[in-house]
């Protein structure tokens, strides 16, 4: 009975068939905007710090996203402050280490890893990265990690580390470059700008 209450009230006030105006949202980025801004960043401003509140806000998206069989088995470690330097030692070599992210989220699984956990992992990482972009931050998703060293660093034997979301404020510009040739999609840097080749829609749709 209450489902269409607002619609009925609208018609009572403005008349049946009156055009309904969509609410105007100021300052809310569209999905396309977030996707375009959500680029892999490898060089970060070292004086721009990520707050604990920002990290919690990023992880909070996982309370709203899909999970295979609704198992919700992923767990998250928020890394900032004194724990950043030792984790950097594990994740990066010089010279990349000194310009790397200033905060991290380590993603774990609380149950044995399987293909559905890996699907959940992809959904989670992309969702958190877009939330970070919404907050004015940038990310690098790092899946090539030494799981044993990370386990030992945080003395956590109960959970298996799967990937790390590296977070900070970009110190480089990254742009998408539409291409037609799929033979070489290697990103490159030119005149201080990092370009990422991307195939066009017609190149990825199967007709």
Task: Give the residues covered by each predicted segment.
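Acidic, surface-exposed loops and disordered segments
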Residues: 1-207
